């Protein structure tokens, strides 16, 4: 069990979100005008339904809130905002945070450990994030903290805990599980050859199926050119689940020549 040392500060009154500025981040460059319009509509509903809570002196403004909402809604652009049910608050630390982790081993001994976290989500309860990693999620590099935690939430809709298999038709579960485990094995083989830091896919994906789904969801939306050719069968399953094809969107985008790693603050 993790004990969270948060102390919420009063959420400031937000002005009307500057959506045009909020959309001007690399990960959203390839969206069509129609998709941007629908994404903003979802993000507006997100901000009406959820409370973004700044912690430890983090200064929240309307632009930050808008970008957070847009990234939360990108994975559910075709699924619908109801897929984000089950939580009401998003807690934002200014940077990765230390928490007390309490766990019991196989013989019943209770251990306490202080660990650094970037984010956390539960089936019922808030999503906890940090601004440093949110800001690093604006580019198209394969890293996206918000999409990672949203993927866990979507995964948990299929049961009590994240399993790596989201809510899909029963007839597709065996194929999904097979392709996901094959991807994990492939990533682990690369790690064994080159090491974790040199792996072309975040090594965290090889730790368990739930993390593989969450990590590959990051790549699905922010680096589809790395995901699709490497795991084509799993890629098609992700396209079917999310109802989106970010690689096709990227290829058809007039912004395709824009640098995918532009830093936005």
Swiss-Prot record:
Role played: Involved in the modulation of the activity of the glucose-phosphotransferase system (glucose-PTS). Interacts with the transcriptional repressor Mlc, preventing its interaction with DNA and leading to the modulation of expression of genes regulated by Mlc, including ptsG, which encodes the PTS system glucose-specific EIICB component.
Origin species, per record, is Escherichia fergusonii (strain ATCC 35469 / DSM 13698 / CCUG 18766 / IAM 14443 / JCM 21226 / LMG 7866 / NBRC 102419 / NCTC 12128 / CDC 0568-73)
Name the chain's protein: Mlc titration factor A
Gene Ontology terms describing biological process: proteolysis
Localization: Cytoplasm
Q: Which SUPFAM superfamilies match?
A: Metalloproteases ('zincins'), catalytic domain
> What Pfam families does the database record attribute to this sequence?
Peptidase_M90 (PF06167)
What CDD domains does its record include? Answer: Peptidase_M90_mtfA
Q: Which domain of life is it from?
A: Bacteria
């Amino acid at each position: 069990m993790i004990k969270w040392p948060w102390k919420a500060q009063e959420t400031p009154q937000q002005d009307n979100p500057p959506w045009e500025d909020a959309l001007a981040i690399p990960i959203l460059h390839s969206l069509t005008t129609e998709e941007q319009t629908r994404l903003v509509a979802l993000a507006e509903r997100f901000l009406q339904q959820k409370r973004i809570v700044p912690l430890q002196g983090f200064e929240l403004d309307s632009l930050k809130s808008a970008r957070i909402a847009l990234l939360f809604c990108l994975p559910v652009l075709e699924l619908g905002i109801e897929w984000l049910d089950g939580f009401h608050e998003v807690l934002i630390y200014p940077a990765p945070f230390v928490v007390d982790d309490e766990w019991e081993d196989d013989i019943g001994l209770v251990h306490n450990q202080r660990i650094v976290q970037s984010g956390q989500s539960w089936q019922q309860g808030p999503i906890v994030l940090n601004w440093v990693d949110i800001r690093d999620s604006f580019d198209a590099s394969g890293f996206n903290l918000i999409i990672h935690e949203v993927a866990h939430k979507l995964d948990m809709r299929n049961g009590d805990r994240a399993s790596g298999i989201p809510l899909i038709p029963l007839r597709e579960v065996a194929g999904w599980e097979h392709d996901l485990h094959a991807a994990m094995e492939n990533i682990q083989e690369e790690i064994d050859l080159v090491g974790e830091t040199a792996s072309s896919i975040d090594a965290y994906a090889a730790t368990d199926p739930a993390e593989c789904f969450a990590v590959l969801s990051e790549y699905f939306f922010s680096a589809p050119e790395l995901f699709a050719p490497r795991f084509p069968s799993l890629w098609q399953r992700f396209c079917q689940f999310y109802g989106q094809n970010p690689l096709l969107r990227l290829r058809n985008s007039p912004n395709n020549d824009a640098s995918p790693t532009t830093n936005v603050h």
